[in-house]
UniProtKB/Swiss-Prot annotation:
Pfam families: ATP-synt_A. It comes from Acinetobacter baumannii (strain ATCC 17978 / DSM 105126 / CIP 53.77 / LMG 1025 / NCDC KC755 / 5377). GO terms for cellular component: plasma membrane; proton-transporting ATP synthase complex. The gene is atpB. This is ATP synthase subunit a. Keywords: ATP synthesis, Cell inner membrane, Cell membrane, CF(0), Hydrogen ion transport, Ion transport, Membrane, Transmembrane, Transmembrane helix, Transport.
Length: 291
Protein backbone atom coordinates (compact mmCIF):
# COMPACT_ATOMS: atom_id res chain seq x y z
CA UNK A 1 0.00 0.00 0.00
CA UNK A 2 1.59 3.25 -1.09
CA UNK A 3 1.79 6.14 1.29
CA UNK A 4 -0.61 8.18 -0.84
CA UNK A 5 -3.42 5.67 -0.21
CA UNK A 6 -3.39 6.38 3.51
CA UNK A 7 -5.75 8.94 4.96
CA UNK A 8 -2.75 10.12 6.95
CA UNK A 9 -0.46 13.09 6.56
CA UNK A 10 3.24 12.45 6.00
CA UNK A 11 4.00 13.16 9.66
CA UNK A 12 1.21 10.84 10.85
CA UNK A 13 2.39 8.15 8.44
CA UNK A 14 5.94 8.29 9.81
CA UNK A 15 4.76 8.27 13.44
CA UNK A 16 2.40 5.37 12.70
CA UNK A 17 5.21 3.22 11.31
CA UNK A 18 7.54 4.06 14.19
CA UNK A 19 5.00 3.26 16.94
CA UNK A 20 4.91 -0.14 18.62
CA UNK A 21 1.85 -2.27 19.30
CA UNK A 22 1.70 -1.62 23.04
CA UNK A 23 -0.36 -3.46 25.64
CA UNK A 24 -0.44 -2.35 29.24
CA UNK A 25 -2.27 -1.00 32.25
CA UNK A 26 -3.97 2.37 31.93
CA UNK A 27 -4.02 4.85 34.84
CA UNK A 28 -7.66 3.87 35.54
CA UNK A 29 -6.58 0.25 36.11
CA UNK A 30 -7.83 -1.25 32.83
CA UNK A 31 -5.59 -3.28 30.54
CA UNK A 32 -5.79 -2.57 26.81
CA UNK A 33 -3.94 -2.02 23.55
CA UNK A 34 -2.78 1.57 23.26
CA UNK A 35 -4.48 3.46 20.44
CA UNK A 36 -2.18 6.48 20.61
CA UNK A 37 1.39 7.22 21.62
CA UNK A 38 0.02 9.17 24.59
CA UNK A 39 -1.86 6.12 25.86
CA UNK A 40 1.25 3.98 25.49
CA UNK A 41 3.26 6.54 27.46
CA UNK A 42 0.65 6.62 30.23
CA UNK A 43 1.03 2.84 30.73
CA UNK A 44 4.48 3.39 32.19
CA UNK A 45 6.47 0.35 33.26
CA UNK A 46 3.60 -2.06 32.55
CA UNK A 47 3.72 -1.32 28.80
CA UNK A 48 4.63 -4.35 26.69
CA UNK A 49 5.62 -4.01 23.04
CA UNK A 50 3.83 -7.06 21.69
CA UNK A 51 5.21 -6.72 18.17
CA UNK A 52 8.87 -6.46 19.22
CA UNK A 53 8.52 -9.29 21.72
CA UNK A 54 6.63 -11.52 19.30
CA UNK A 55 9.04 -11.03 16.39
CA UNK A 56 12.17 -11.42 18.52
CA UNK A 57 10.89 -14.64 20.12
CA UNK A 58 9.65 -15.94 16.77
CA UNK A 59 12.96 -15.24 15.03
CA UNK A 60 14.81 -16.86 17.93
CA UNK A 61 12.69 -19.99 17.50
CA UNK A 62 13.35 -19.98 13.74
CA UNK A 63 17.09 -19.70 14.42
CA UNK A 64 17.02 -22.68 16.81
CA UNK A 65 14.89 -24.78 14.45
CA UNK A 66 17.10 -24.10 11.43
CA UNK A 67 20.29 -25.03 13.26
CA UNK A 68 18.62 -28.08 14.83
CA UNK A 69 17.43 -29.30 11.42
CA UNK A 70 20.90 -28.83 9.94
CA UNK A 71 22.51 -30.63 12.90
CA UNK A 72 20.09 -33.55 12.53
CA UNK A 73 20.70 -33.81 8.79
CA UNK A 74 24.48 -33.35 8.95
CA UNK A 75 26.52 -36.25 7.63
CA UNK A 76 30.03 -37.01 6.50
CA UNK A 77 28.99 -37.10 2.85
CA UNK A 78 28.51 -34.21 0.47
CA UNK A 79 26.81 -31.40 2.45
CA UNK A 80 23.91 -29.41 1.05
CA UNK A 81 24.40 -25.75 0.18
CA UNK A 82 22.39 -24.71 3.21
CA UNK A 83 24.44 -26.96 5.49
CA UNK A 84 27.64 -25.52 4.03
CA UNK A 85 26.38 -21.98 4.68
CA UNK A 86 25.57 -22.83 8.31
CA UNK A 87 28.98 -24.45 8.77
CA UNK A 88 30.66 -21.34 7.35
CA UNK A 89 28.83 -19.16 9.87
CA UNK A 90 29.78 -21.46 12.75
CA UNK A 91 33.44 -21.58 11.68
CA UNK A 92 33.53 -17.80 11.27
CA UNK A 93 32.12 -17.20 14.75
CA UNK A 94 34.32 -19.89 16.30
CA UNK A 95 37.48 -18.40 14.78
CA UNK A 96 36.44 -14.94 16.00
CA UNK A 97 36.06 -16.29 19.53
CA UNK A 98 39.41 -18.12 19.43
CA UNK A 99 41.21 -14.99 18.22
CA UNK A 100 39.58 -12.62 20.71
CA UNK A 101 38.62 -14.48 23.89
CA UNK A 102 41.69 -15.50 25.88
CA UNK A 103 39.97 -17.16 28.81
CA UNK A 104 38.54 -20.65 29.12
CA UNK A 105 34.79 -21.05 28.75
CA UNK A 106 32.56 -23.30 26.69
CA UNK A 107 29.79 -20.72 26.86
CA UNK A 108 31.39 -17.96 24.78
CA UNK A 109 31.24 -19.55 21.30
CA UNK A 110 27.55 -20.60 21.54
CA UNK A 111 26.72 -17.19 23.03
CA UNK A 112 28.52 -15.38 20.21
CA UNK A 113 26.80 -17.53 17.58
CA UNK A 114 23.39 -16.86 19.13
CA UNK A 115 24.00 -13.12 19.30
CA UNK A 116 25.26 -12.87 15.72
CA UNK A 117 22.54 -14.93 14.04
CA UNK A 118 19.68 -13.67 16.20
CA UNK A 119 20.55 -10.00 15.71
CA UNK A 120 21.14 -10.60 11.99
CA UNK A 121 17.67 -12.13 11.63
CA UNK A 122 16.07 -9.26 13.55
CA UNK A 123 17.92 -6.72 11.40
CA UNK A 124 17.01 -8.62 8.24
CA UNK A 125 13.34 -7.81 8.83
CA UNK A 126 14.24 -4.24 7.86
CA UNK A 127 14.44 -5.34 4.21
CA UNK A 128 10.73 -6.24 4.08
CA UNK A 129 8.77 -3.35 2.48
CA UNK A 130 7.53 -1.10 5.25
CA UNK A 131 3.82 -1.36 4.37
CA UNK A 132 3.39 -5.07 3.68
CA UNK A 133 3.01 -6.63 7.13
CA UNK A 134 1.56 -3.52 8.85
CA UNK A 135 -1.11 -3.46 6.12
CA UNK A 136 -2.04 -7.07 6.93
CA UNK A 137 -2.12 -6.22 10.65
CA UNK A 138 -4.38 -3.21 9.98
CA UNK A 139 -6.72 -5.36 7.87
CA UNK A 140 -6.96 -8.03 10.58
CA UNK A 141 -7.43 -5.42 13.31
CA UNK A 142 -10.20 -3.66 11.40
CA UNK A 143 -12.10 -6.70 10.12
CA UNK A 144 -11.58 -9.18 12.96
CA UNK A 145 -11.34 -6.99 16.06
CA UNK A 146 -13.24 -3.94 14.83
CA UNK A 147 -10.33 -1.56 15.46
CA UNK A 148 -9.57 1.67 13.65
CA UNK A 149 -6.89 0.63 11.11
CA UNK A 150 -5.06 3.90 11.71
CA UNK A 151 -4.65 2.87 15.36
CA UNK A 152 -3.27 -0.59 14.60
CA UNK A 153 0.49 -0.31 15.09
CA UNK A 154 2.80 -3.15 14.11
CA UNK A 155 6.57 -2.73 13.87
CA UNK A 156 8.39 -5.74 12.45
CA UNK A 157 12.05 -4.87 13.16
CA UNK A 158 12.77 -5.74 16.81
CA UNK A 159 16.20 -4.10 16.77
CA UNK A 160 14.57 -0.69 16.17
CA UNK A 161 13.06 -0.99 19.66
CA UNK A 162 15.47 0.21 22.39
CA UNK A 163 13.80 -2.16 24.87
CA UNK A 164 15.00 -5.14 22.84
CA UNK A 165 18.55 -3.88 22.36
CA UNK A 166 18.83 -2.81 26.01
CA UNK A 167 17.51 -6.19 27.13
CA UNK A 168 20.20 -7.99 25.14
CA UNK A 169 22.97 -5.66 26.31
CA UNK A 170 21.89 -6.01 29.95
CA UNK A 171 22.16 -9.79 29.58
CA UNK A 172 25.72 -9.28 28.36
CA UNK A 173 26.34 -6.92 31.29
CA UNK A 174 25.24 -9.59 33.77
CA UNK A 175 27.68 -12.03 32.15
CA UNK A 176 30.47 -9.44 32.39
CA UNK A 177 29.78 -9.12 36.13
CA UNK A 178 29.68 -12.90 36.52
CA UNK A 179 33.00 -13.50 34.75
CA UNK A 180 34.70 -10.60 36.53
CA UNK A 181 33.72 -11.85 39.99
CA UNK A 182 34.36 -15.51 39.12
CA UNK A 183 37.89 -14.86 37.87
CA UNK A 184 38.98 -12.12 40.28
CA UNK A 185 36.73 -12.58 43.29
CA UNK A 186 34.65 -9.82 44.83
CA UNK A 187 37.70 -8.17 46.38
CA UNK A 188 39.69 -8.32 43.17
CA UNK A 189 36.80 -6.90 41.16
CA UNK A 190 36.25 -4.02 43.59
CA UNK A 191 40.00 -3.43 43.75
CA UNK A 192 40.16 -3.22 39.97
CA UNK A 193 37.52 -0.49 40.04
CA UNK A 194 39.09 1.39 42.97
CA UNK A 195 42.76 1.26 41.96
CA UNK A 196 42.56 2.00 38.23
CA UNK A 197 43.50 3.99 36.23
CA UNK A 198 45.44 5.93 38.91
CA UNK A 199 47.46 3.72 41.27
CA UNK A 200 50.33 5.70 42.84
CA UNK A 201 52.75 4.03 45.23
CA UNK A 202 52.13 6.62 47.94
CA UNK A 203 49.38 5.21 50.22
CA UNK A 204 47.91 8.64 51.02
CA UNK A 205 47.67 9.59 47.34
CA UNK A 206 46.27 6.15 46.58
CA UNK A 207 43.51 6.59 49.18
CA UNK A 208 42.67 10.08 47.92
CA UNK A 209 42.39 8.86 44.32
CA UNK A 210 40.08 5.93 45.11
CA UNK A 211 36.87 8.03 44.71
CA UNK A 212 38.16 9.40 41.40
CA UNK A 213 39.02 5.91 40.18
CA UNK A 214 35.62 4.58 41.22
CA UNK A 215 33.79 7.33 39.35
CA UNK A 216 35.85 6.87 36.18
CA UNK A 217 35.73 3.07 36.20
CA UNK A 218 32.04 2.84 37.07
CA UNK A 219 31.15 5.25 34.25
CA UNK A 220 33.26 3.20 31.83
CA UNK A 221 31.81 -0.07 33.13
CA UNK A 222 28.19 1.08 32.93
CA UNK A 223 28.70 2.69 29.53
CA UNK A 224 29.44 -0.67 27.91
CA UNK A 225 25.90 -2.11 27.88
CA UNK A 226 24.40 1.29 27.10
CA UNK A 227 26.70 1.85 24.12
CA UNK A 228 26.06 -1.70 22.89
CA UNK A 229 22.31 -1.14 22.95
CA UNK A 230 22.23 2.38 21.54
CA UNK A 231 24.67 1.64 18.71
CA UNK A 232 22.50 -1.18 17.39
CA UNK A 233 19.24 0.68 18.00
CA UNK A 234 20.45 3.94 16.45
CA UNK A 235 21.75 2.40 13.24
CA UNK A 236 18.70 0.22 12.67
CA UNK A 237 16.23 2.96 13.61
CA UNK A 238 17.87 5.35 11.15
CA UNK A 239 17.78 2.71 8.41
CA UNK A 240 14.10 2.02 9.04
CA UNK A 241 13.33 5.74 8.99
CA UNK A 242 14.99 6.11 5.59
CA UNK A 243 12.86 3.25 4.20
CA UNK A 244 9.74 4.99 5.54
CA UNK A 245 10.75 8.30 3.98
CA UNK A 246 11.33 6.55 0.64
CA UNK A 247 7.83 5.02 0.90
CA UNK A 248 6.38 8.53 1.00
CA UNK A 249 7.74 9.28 -2.48
CA UNK A 250 5.92 8.54 -5.75
CA UNK A 251 5.97 4.87 -6.76
CA UNK A 252 8.36 5.29 -9.68
CA UNK A 253 10.93 7.02 -7.44
CA UNK A 254 10.56 4.47 -4.62
CA UNK A 255 12.15 1.66 -6.62
CA UNK A 256 14.99 3.87 -7.83
CA UNK A 257 15.94 4.67 -4.23
CA UNK A 258 14.81 1.67 -2.19
CA UNK A 259 16.73 -0.96 -4.16
CA UNK A 260 20.18 0.71 -3.81
CA UNK A 261 19.47 1.51 -0.16
CA UNK A 262 18.37 -2.08 0.50
CA UNK A 263 21.55 -3.43 -1.10
CA UNK A 264 23.68 -1.10 1.03
CA UNK A 265 21.57 -1.94 4.09
CA UNK A 266 22.50 -5.62 3.75
CA UNK A 267 26.02 -4.56 4.71
CA UNK A 268 24.69 -2.47 7.61
CA UNK A 269 22.54 -5.22 9.14
CA UNK A 270 25.40 -7.73 8.90
CA UNK A 271 27.96 -5.29 10.26
CA UNK A 272 25.79 -4.33 13.23
CA UNK A 273 25.29 -7.98 14.19
CA UNK A 274 29.05 -8.55 13.87
CA UNK A 275 29.94 -5.48 15.96
CA UNK A 276 27.55 -6.47 18.77
CA UNK A 277 29.00 -9.99 18.77
CA UNK A 278 32.64 -8.86 18.73
CA UNK A 279 32.20 -6.27 21.47
CA UNK A 280 30.48 -8.90 23.61
CA UNK A 281 33.45 -11.23 23.15
CA UNK A 282 35.93 -8.43 23.89
CA UNK A 283 34.12 -7.35 27.05
CA UNK A 284 33.88 -10.92 28.33
CA UNK A 285 37.56 -11.48 27.52
CA UNK A 286 38.49 -8.36 29.50
CA UNK A 287 36.33 -9.56 32.39
CA UNK A 288 38.12 -12.93 32.39
CA UNK A 289 41.62 -11.47 32.53
CA UNK A 290 43.42 -11.38 35.86
CA UNK A 291 45.62 -8.37 36.57
Amino acid sequence: MAAEEHALTSTEYIKHHLTNMTYGKMPDGTWKLAETAEEAHSMGFTAIHLDSMGWSIGLGVIFCLLFWIVARAANAGVPTKFQSAIEMIIEFVDSSVRDTFHGKSRLIAPLALTIFVWIFLMNLMDLIPVDWIPQVAAFVGANVFGMDPHHVYFKIVPSTDPNITLGMSLSVFVLILFYSIREKGVGGFVGELALNPFNPSNPVAKALLIPVNLILELVTFLARPISLALRLFGNMYAGELIFILIALLPFWIQWALSVPWAIFHILVITLQAFIFMMLTIVYLSMASEKH
